[in-house]
Amino acid sequence: VSAAVTAMISDSVREQLLTRAMAFVGASIGVSFTFSLVISPILADSIGVPGIFLLTALLCMLAIGAVLMLPTAPVKRFENFRARAKLRDVFLHSQLMRLNLGIFSLHMAQMALFVVIPLRLAELDLVVAQHWTVYLPAVLVSLAFLMPVLRHAEKTGRTKELFVGAICLVLAAFAGFEIFDNSVLLISVLLLVFFSGFNVLEASLPSLVSKTAPQECKGLALGVYNTTQSVGVFIGGAAGGWLYSVFGTHGVYGFCAALMVLWIIAAQGMTAPARGNVEADS
């Protein structure tokens, strides 16, 4: 689903506005993620876990209805042998490999982190029903800075610098968790730092993939990108649980920080996509 959505946006939005369009998608994902953390305990108490799955199915049906009302976009067709060649090219494209490594690492780290943060908050005597008081402000404040920062980076041609800076911000958050996870207030501040970097990366990565991939295989490149993201989510959840059981919270923080260090090293070889003209009224 996420691959189809990002591919549709890539095909429908002008390149000058692509990063901001992806930012809106990333912001909606961030708000949805936070809302799920807030509402899940309430739903679990009222309708139970089976009810949550039924609610998810209902929301999927509503999403299908919304998609059916969209106008049909023109389809570009390619021969099968060309599609196979392009799949190989997408996997072996050095710049796309760096971006795919990035989204894999980012979501692996996010899932591993949120294996332990709820447990740590509970250890600090914050009841589950009050966890939203930590998550929601961190996400909303971080989103307030997202669009101005992205717009400035686009206009000044400093997309790569912003990208690497956002990774460093996430790394700083994990380093902070290693030292300052002993109070709810400090965890709240560090989550704000984390989401400030995370939201920039979440918005920038699909746009960079779309701009980097060859024109005829953007959808394929975004499909590989989203698959890599999903694999990162799965492995991150599993790795976070195992690391917590063996090494505790600090083992998880250290693992996430190591992922960000590796990503920063890989990102040094990135080449920023050609800068498009930014319209004055955009």
Can you say where each PLM-predicted feature lies in the sequence?
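Short amphipathic helix-loop junctions that connect adjacent transmembrane helices
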Residues: 115-130
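A membrane-interface helix-boundary motif in multi-pass transporters
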Residues: 45-58, 242-260
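Structural signature of the two symmetry-related core transmembrane helices
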Residues: 161-175
